[in-house]
Amino acid sequence: MLFRSLAKSGKRVLCLDMDVGLRNLDLALGMTDCALMDFTDVLFGRCTLARAAVEHPKLSGLFLLTAPVHFDRQAITTEAMQALMKQILNQYDFCLIDCPAGIGQGFHLAASCADRAILTVTNDTAALRDAQQVVLQLRPYGLPAKLVVNRVSRWMVRKIQMNVDDAMDMAGLPLLGVVPDDRKVPVANVKGELLVTQQNRGAARGYANIAQRLCGKRVPIGWK
């Protein structure tokens, strides 16, 4: 949802799906039938970046460059990904990489061509322990990293007694933003809709605030 908020603010944004073999960012964006080329087509010169990156049909400025379904991961090198990122940054204001789950080759390829990292976690011990491991793996790349705490509710804070400050301490990261728990999010995902275009509160408001901070604006951190 962050990429949607950035695009809505007038930025030219590319979503790069790097989950090779398990891509699903096209589903989240409602662009299943739109993405015909993937980033390996650009890497190996089969088409241009302008042709492979598809603009969202309902939100101007939001583009998707998807991952391949079947491909030899060993053929995708760090040098090739860094060259691709140079192309991307010449044409877009932001490139948000959807990093694959786990700490494997896809994770390290994504880290090698990024200039910062955003860790999105829920406010529970298991997720925060995973975040600690990710932070350790990111250190060799020298990437500045920040934390987004997702699905936060006042009820959870009261019952579990674990608040956002606790999450920051456990992950060892500064806070970029807080996203409230919002029942509209799974409904919008199932329908392939852009929640941020429907409302300006709840999770959409949380991500809009994060987008403004990424653009250098000072926005208070809080949730409703």
Language-model-detected regions and their locations in the chain:
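Alpha-helical scaffold segments in soluble metabolic enzymes
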Residues: 5, 41, 52, 83, ...
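Amphipathic alpha-helical transducer elements in NTP-driven molecular machines
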Residues: 36, 50, 78, 82, ...
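Short, small-residue-biased leader/transition segments that mark boundaries at the very start
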Residues: 1-2
